[in-house]
Each structure stands twice: as C-alpha cells, then as structure tokens.
Amino acid sequence: MDYTLTRIDPDGDNDRYPLQKQEVVSDPLEQHVHRSVYMGKLDHALHDMVNWGRKNSLWPYNFGLSCCYVEMVTSFTAVHDVARFGAEVLRASPRQADFMVVAGTCFTKMAPVIQRLYEQMLEPKWVISMGACANSGGMYDIYSVVQGVDKFIPVDVYIPGCPPRPEAYMQALMLLQESIGQERRPLSWVVGDQGVYRANMQSERERKRAERIAVTNLRTPDEI
C-alpha cells in the first residue's frame, strides 16, 4: 500500500496552508522489518495498538455552520447511537477535540475562523467535510461562499448529500477509523521519524464503480 508522507516545511515555496511538503512513499514500517525482524514487528505492534486507541476514541469538535449540522446531531440520538464508535463526546474547545466536522455552508467571512480553530487543535487531528456546501460550495456558486473547505484546510473524508443522512455521517466515521488504523505517526516527538504517513485509501467512488455499473433496474422514489 502506498502512503503519502507529509512534513512541515515553513521555508518552502508553498503558498497554500498548511506550509508542508508531500510525497508518495511505501510503508515505512516495512523498511524496519527488513533491517531487523524483531524491532520491525515491535514497531508494527506499537503502531497498531496506538492507532486502535486513536480510532476508537474520536472526540468531535462541536462546530456547525448550517442544516447539515442538524443531521450530524441526529446521529447522537439513541436511534443511531454513535457512541458505538467512541465518538459521542462532543468538545466545546478545539484543544480537546480530535477531529472537526465542517457541516454546512462555509462563507468567506467564516473561513479565517475555521482555519484558526483548526490550528488550535492538537495533533493528531482530522477533518470531515459534511455536505455539498462544505465539499464544493453546493448550490451557492457566489463570491461570498468558499467553493470547498479543502481550499484552506486539509480534508480527510468527504460526505456527499444536501443534507447527508445521519447514516452517511456514521459511515464517514467508519472510513476515518479505517484510515487512522493504517496511519504511521511519530510515537513521540523525540523518537523515530517525525513525518506523518497516511495510507492512500481507495475512494468509495472507485470501490463501488463496478457495482453501480451493473445495476440495470432502478427503483422509483416511492419504493426506496
């Protein structure tokens, strides 16, 4: 599996936030296995254990912009019970949150606020873009709406829909957990490589392409 290596590069020529450089590399732990089987397997076990704890204890930042936030909050009710994924502890401060859900329309005046709140979140941190407006501006193709929050912050998971259902938000959590389980992050700020390795997961569009092409009979809206 290929990984995207991200390193902070404040002196680089990148004019977009964040100031970093990226490159596609192979799994760094495989190199440790080739050098030393014992230490390589130990690194694998340590990363698996740390990633297991991270992905099963995701605390979302309580931050909503529009109607998509209503659907997000609905997933916290007993009907959907998002507590099964360890993501029911809403945080009112970005310094205590693990990931941010940008749910709704991002206006130009709100973009600096979102970026500053993202900067206040501690590493490791992730971002979910929820809804068509957050993904690409939606139906608001005007000067006052940002055409996608990935213009100023990195996004890990995109949720399509206007607005998405609570089940879509829960699926996004599961996809984020799957991605976190494959990450390779520094175990300490003084131990090992300080780069962040994120697995290049296959998109849901590509994964379901053959299944969708094979569909020949479409149900009417009243049959769904």
UniProtKB/Swiss-Prot annotation:
It is an enzyme of class 7 (translocase). [4Fe-4S] cluster binds at C67, C68, C133, C162. It comes from the Bacteria. Keywords: 4Fe-4S, Cell inner membrane, Cell membrane, Iron, Iron-sulfur, Membrane, Metal-binding, NAD, Quinone, Translocase, Transport, Ubiquinone. It is a peripheral membrane protein. The keyword Plastid does not apply. One of its GO terms (molecular function) is quinone binding. Pfam families: Oxidored_q6 (PF01058). The keyword 4Fe-4S applies. Belongs to the complex I 20 kDa subunit family. This is NADH-quinone oxidoreductase subunit B. It comes from Edwardsiella ictaluri (strain 93-146). The gene is nuoB.
